[in-house]
């Protein structure tokens, strides 16, 4: 590498190190919430056709754990998900008023269509309408934070990490 290339790389690194994503202010957050709730998220007037019976909530919990738990945690709070708060935007707590203020049809619409450009994928064509509605029922009846443990994929990773640290301590 020649001197000018090194200078450009160092200059770009210096400039970019000053760039960071700042949290939106209260006014920006409130405006974004209003836009999401009133304009961009469909299904506002669509009622949930699946009754919130214990059986349907349990079915919703199973579908949620299988499809949604890797990002939202098994409890909808991100419990045990190592990157939940590192995403931009962070993965929301599904028990938060921001999420719970959505109508059932809006929650189903989000599950079905996803939210771009966030990491929320579309489940259209993967989950049936009935499965999505059951997930909505589960989201309406979330268990206490941490009560369901952490997703198996992260539990295995955590156990491996702890196992490695135990061996490191033993070898010292």
Question: Where do the model's predicted regions map?
Answer:
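Detector for the c-type heme attachment site
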Residues: 72-78, 112-113, 125, 140
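Sequence/structural segment immediately N-terminal to covalent heme-attachment motifs in c-type
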Residues: 53-77, 84, 107-109
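Electrostatic cytochrome c docking/interface patches
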Residues: 26, 30-63
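Bacterial signal peptide processing site
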Residues: 20-22
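Bacterial N-terminal signal peptides that target proteins for export
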Residues: 1-7
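Short Fe-S-cluster ligation motifs
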Residues: 98-113
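Flexible coil segments in periplasmic/lumen-exposed cytochrome c-class electron-transfer proteins
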Residues: 42-43, 104, 122-172
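C-terminal motif of bacterial Sec signal peptides marking the signal peptidase cleavage site
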Residues: 15-18
């Amino acid at each position: 590498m020649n001197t000018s290339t090194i200078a450009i790389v160092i200059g770009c690194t210096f400039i970019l190190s000053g760039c960071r994503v700042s949290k939106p202010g209260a006014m920006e957050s409130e405006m974004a919430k209003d836009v999401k709730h009133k304009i961009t998220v469909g299904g506002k007037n669509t009622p949930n056709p699946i009754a919130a019976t214990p059986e349907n909530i349990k079915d919703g919990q199973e579908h949620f754990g299988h499809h949604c738990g890797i990002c939202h945690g098994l409890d909808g709070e991100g419990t045990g998900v190592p990157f939940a708060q590192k995403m931009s935007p962070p993965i929301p707590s599904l028990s938060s008023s921001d999420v719970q203020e959505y109508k059932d049809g809006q929650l189903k619409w989000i599950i079905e269509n996803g939210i771009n450009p966030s990491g929320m994928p579309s489940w259209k064509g993967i989950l049936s309408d009935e499965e999505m509605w059951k997930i909505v029922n589960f989201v309406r009846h979330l268990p206490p934070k941490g009560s369901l443990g952490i997703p198996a994929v992260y539990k295995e990773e955590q156990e491996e990490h702890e196992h490695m640290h135990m061996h490191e301590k033993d070898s010292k």
